[in-house]
């Protein structure tokens, strides 16, 4: 088992246990699990602190309507493996699709990840 596999297994185990926050590739992420949490996502926020994000479960497509800042989206499969990354998604983008394999998305403030 590689270190990436171990990290992914830890993520999946934390999600199955009902964790409200998890670590994904060094990012501390709030987990949006319920319908209302997933629908709201990052709406109403002016940004995120560096090293933080939101992990939206049961999601393979996002929008940035009503967002106040650009985001980076990292789409993950059920095992926690990255299937697609989209950087610099501006507010008011109507449709960003992660692909058929995506089951969750990690949203990050792209103003904090520009140098990475």
Q: Which residue ranges define each predicted feature?
A:
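Compact, glycine-rich, soluble single-domain proteins
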Residues: 2-116
């Amino acid at each position: 088992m590689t270190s990436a596999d171990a990290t992914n297994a830890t993520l999946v185990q934390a999600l199955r246990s009902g964790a409200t926050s998890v670590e994904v590739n060094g990012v501390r992420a709030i987990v949006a699990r319920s319908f209302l949490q997933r629908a709201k996502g990052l709406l109403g926020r002016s940004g995120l602190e560096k090293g933080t994000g939101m992990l939206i479960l049961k999601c393979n497509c996002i929008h940035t309507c009503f967002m106040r800042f650009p985001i980076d989206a990292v789409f993950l499969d059920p095992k926690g493996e990255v299937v697609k990354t989209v950087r610099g998604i501006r507010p008011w983008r109507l449709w960003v699709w992660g692909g058929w394999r995506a089951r969750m998305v990690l949203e990050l403030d792209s103003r904090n990840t520009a140098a990475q």
